[in-house]
């Protein structure tokens, strides 16, 4: 990426992300949301395993956001790899999805629905080095893809202009060797700058994949923004390119080489690089909440991953 104008945009995005991340973690209201998730939802539920059980997923989502935003702050402002925060954020993201799915499968779905963007965290699981979690999350999401009435699976992808969820799906399918084609699924070449990476994902040549990965990184950088036409619309992913890291992890899992690619995106922050798999943390709150939640909703939650 040598375009001077692009470098200016890149630096501006980095500065914006630094301000956003630091501002978020210092706002008292966000701390109150995190603490409220524990005090107002999880603690009462742990006392009787019934109170506000339908809100357990939303509480887990708030806690996941808390940890992930702290990880972003550490990443862009302290330039440190936020392993503890990142692993906790990933773990709570995973169980939010599983618990929400369990409620969606119940007689009272309580307003929970599959979001089109929920496929992106499958890449996050791979970036963390948690393939079992990635498989489980993807299977959970595909369950809802066809079942959910009026869900995003029944809407042409162009309607949303979202690239990354479909990149996540195509990466997953290539990794798992699935040839299933979903309704309204875009062709690889419709995903523009991500197409070469998808096409060379399992190429035996590490150099061929590396060249394609650099093109995808260019496309990622160009697409960071909040407008409808932007490719990477979620700020948390601007400097944590989970779709690119997932592609590298898939090659590792397939026993294929990944060469070191020089690119400003990969060098800007610690989360721009693929790291060794993180250990799955043991979290005391989850260890108490999840078994009770599974029991409270009738056992429709498999706690084994």
Give residue spans per PLM region:
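Solvent-exposed interaction surfaces and binding hotspots enriched for charged
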Residues: 3-4
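Eukaryote-skewed repeat-based solenoidal scaffolds used as protein-protein interaction platforms
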Residues: 8-221
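Acidic, Ser/Thr-rich low-complexity linear motifs
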Residues: 152-156, 225-237
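Residue-level signal for functionally critical sites in structured catalytic/ligand-binding pockets
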Residues: 191, 220, 224, 236, ...
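Non-catalytic carbohydrate-binding regions of carbohydrate-active enzymes
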Residues: 204-232, 270-280
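C-terminal structured domains
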Residues: 230-305
